[in-house]
Amino acid sequence: MNLQHHFLIAMPALQDPIFRRSVVYICEHNTNGAMGIIVNKPLENLKIEGILEKLKITPEPRDESIRLDKPVMLGGPLAEDRGFILHTPPSNFASSIRISDNTVMTTSRDVLETLGTDKQPSDILVALGYASWEKGQLEQEILDNAWLTAPADLNILFKTPIADRWREAAKLIGVDILTMPGVAGHA
């Protein structure tokens, strides 16, 4: 089972405060473990423009049609001070990993320098932190019914309203997650 370029969808019974009702985009999955980014947990009061200001990055030349007021996500509980940018190609940045034909993860400053300009990738998601699982840990959590899995969908990853991503990701595999046991008051 290789879950790279898949979503992990938290089951309703998963009550961990970070992973409750989360959708995790799996960036890497191999025999050593897995690494992913939570894509539906916005950090309070932190937008992309705020990250650029903190890093003293000024988009040049500024393309006013590109919105920089999108929220930054809590990507996971590890390295919460480190940025991870999921985006569509190109992948010609200093530190990029191609996850699929249409998805790239970049951790270098040069991608941030394109934000708000005509050189910005067409779709972006900025996160601080990541989630990881040791060898066999994720597979066991799936067997323990902590997660559903679904092939990743770029519309959900980049365009679906954040509050709807959990439910929409489950719909990819025909599940209405709000009617599952463990979701009180939504049946």
From Swiss-Prot:
GO cellular component, one term: cytosol
Family: Belongs to the UPF0301 (AlgH) family.
HAMAP family: UPF0301
SUPFAM superfamilies cross-referenced by the UniProt entry: VC0467-like (SSF143456)
NCBIfam families: PRK00228.1-1
Full protein name: UPF0301 protein YqgE
Lineage of the species this protein comes from: Bacteria, Pseudomonadati, Pseudomonadota, Gammaproteobacteria, Enterobacterales
InterPro entries assigned to the protein according to its UniProt record, in alphabetical order: AlgH-like
Pfam families associated with the record: DUF179
Species in which this protein is naturally found: Escherichia coli (strain SMS-3-5 / SECEC)
